[in-house]
C-alpha cells in the first residue's frame, strides 16, 4: 500500500547515532530498541477505537476509548529482529510473538528459511514484522509469503533502514503491505548491503562483529 518514512526529530537523531563508526554494542542495541518503539507508535496510529464505559477513580461512570478488539502478533525475523523486540513490546505488552528465521545466501543473496513458529490464530491478527534492515527485499518477501500462507490478512513491516531496491521489490510482490521506516537510503552495494546503511545490524546488536 505505501512506504512511510518517519521524520520525527527523535527518530532521525537516534538513527544518526546508530550510523556512527565505532558505536558500542550496548549503545547500538539500546538505540535499536528505542527507534523500534518510536516506529511502532507510528505503525499503530490507525488502530480502530471503540467507546467503553468504566467506573472512574471517584466511582462515577465515564466513557473512554479502547482499541477495538485488535489482536496483534509481533514477528521478529531472526536474528537481528530480536534487537527491536523490547522496544516494540513496551508499547504492545499483550501482543503475541511469532518468530521467523531466514538467513541470506551471501553469494545468491536469496533467503534460506530455517525456522518458523507462528501463533495458531494468526489469521485473526495484525502482524507487525520487525527487522532492522530491508535490503534486497528477498527475506522480507519470503517472510510475508510465510505469513500469508498461514492465513494472515493484515501485515505491516517495521524496519529501521531500507534500500529503495528492497522497498520496490517488496511492494511489487505484496502491494497490500505497509512499510514503516526511519530512512530509505541511497542504494545497495554489490554485496547487497545498504548504503550508507548501518553495517551488519545483527553483528552490532549481538556483539559478534
Swiss-Prot record:
Its cofactor is Mg(2+). Uracil binds at residues 194, 199-201. InterPro entries: PRibTrfase_dom, PRTase-like, Upp_B, UPRTase/APRTase, Ura_phspho_trans. Gene3D superfamilies: 3.40.50.2020. GO terms for molecular function: GTP binding; magnesium ion binding; uracil phosphoribosyltransferase activity. CDD domains: PRTases_typeI. Keywords: Allosteric enzyme, Glycosyltransferase, GTP-binding, Magnesium, Nucleotide-binding, Transferase. Pathway: Pyrimidine metabolism; UMP biosynthesis via salvage pathway; UMP from uracil: step 1/1. Its EC number is 2.4.2.9. Allosterically activated by GTP. The keyword Glycosyltransferase applies. It catalyses: UMP + diphosphate = 5-phospho-alpha-D-ribose 1-diphosphate + uracil. 5-phospho-alpha-D-ribose 1-diphosphate binds at residues 79, 104, 131-139, 200. It holds the Pfam family UPRTase. Binds 1 Mg(2+) ion per subunit. The magnesium is bound as Mg-PRPP. Belongs to the UPRTase family. This is Uracil phosphoribosyltransferase. It comes from Pseudoalteromonas translucida (strain TAC 125).
Amino acid at each position: 500500500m505505501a512506504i512511510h518514512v518517519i521524520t520525527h526529530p527523535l527518530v532521525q537523531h537516534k538513527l544518526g547515532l546508530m550510523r556512527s563508526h565505532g558505536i558500542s554494542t550496548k549503545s547500538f542495541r539500546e538505540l535499536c530498541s528505542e527507534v523500534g518503539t518510536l516506529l511502532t507508535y507510528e505503525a499503530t496510529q490507525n488502530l480502530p477505537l471503540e467507546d467503553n464505559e468504566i467506573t472512574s477513580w471517584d466511582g462515577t461512570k465515564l466513557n473512554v476509548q479502547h482499541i477495538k478488539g485488535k489482536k496483534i502478533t509481533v514477528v521478529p525475523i531472526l536474528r537481528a529482529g530480536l534487537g527491536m523486540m523490547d522496544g516494540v513490546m513496551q508499547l504492545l505488552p499483550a501482543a503475541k510473538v511469532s518468530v521467523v528465521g531466514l538467513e541470506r545466501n551471501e553469494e545468491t543473496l536469496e533467503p534460506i528459511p530455517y525456522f518458523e513458529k507462528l501463533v495458531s490464530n494468526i489469521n485473526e491478527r495484525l502482524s507487525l514484522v520487525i527487522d532492522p534492515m530491508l535490503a534486497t527485499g528477498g527475506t522480507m518477501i519470503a517472510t510475508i509469503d510465510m505469513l500469508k500462507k498461514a492465513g494472515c490478512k493484515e501485515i505491516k513491516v517495521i524496519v529501521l533502514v531500507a534500500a529503495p531496491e528492497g522497498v520496490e521489490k517488496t511492494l511489487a510482490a505484496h502491494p497490500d503491505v505497509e512499510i514503516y521506516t526511519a530512512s530509505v537510503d541511497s542504494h545497495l552495494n554489490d554485496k547487497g548491503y545498504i548504503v550508507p546503511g548501518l553495517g551488519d545490524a545483527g553483528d552490532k546488536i549481538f556483539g559478534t562483529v
